[in-house]
Amino acid sequence: MKGWLFLVIAIVGEVIATSALKSSEGFTKLAPSAVVIIGYGIAFYFLSLVLKSIPVGVAYAVWSGLGVVIITAIAWLLHGQKLDAWGFVGMGLIVSGVVVLNLLSKASAH
């Protein structure tokens, strides 16, 4: 259970860091650049803890899949990124894949 909590923390850290990348303007703005560095540091530290209890393939699939969906949603909602019906279908498939991997696949057993 602790592994999944750590994975959520890793995903949140990665999402915050990636969201701040645009504001850092190529690491020329100090505050957003610090958020990027700290966020990625938190993300990778907690991902390393996750790997003690969750298989790397499962952890990385959940981390990257949900990260992509959340980042895309943030860009769509806050930054006006265009997202058509196929974009929503693709994100739905990513989430579906993560659910299948975790609920139905034996790969998630440790």
From Swiss-Prot:
Transport as UniProt keyword: yes
Record keyword Transmembrane helix present: yes
Alphabetical UniProt keywords: Cell membrane, Membrane, Plasmid, Transmembrane, Transmembrane helix, Transport
Molecular functions (GO terms): transmembrane transporter activity
Coiled-coil boundaries: none
Membrane topology classification: Multi-pass membrane protein
InterPro entries: Small_drug/metabolite_transptr (IPR000390), Small_multidrug_res (IPR045324)
Localization (cell): Cell membrane
GO cellular component, one term: plasma membrane
TM spans (from-to): 1-21, 30-50, 58-78, 85-105
UniProt family annotation: Belongs to the drug/metabolite transporter (DMT) superfamily. Small multidrug resistance (SMR) (TC 2.A.7.1) family.
Biological role stated in the UniProt entry: Multidrug exporter. Is implicated for the resistance to bacteriocidal quaternary ammonium compounds.
Alphabetical list of NCBIfam families matching this protein: SMR_qac_E, SMR_qac_int
Protein name: Quaternary ammonium compound-resistance protein QacE
Gene name in the database record: qacE
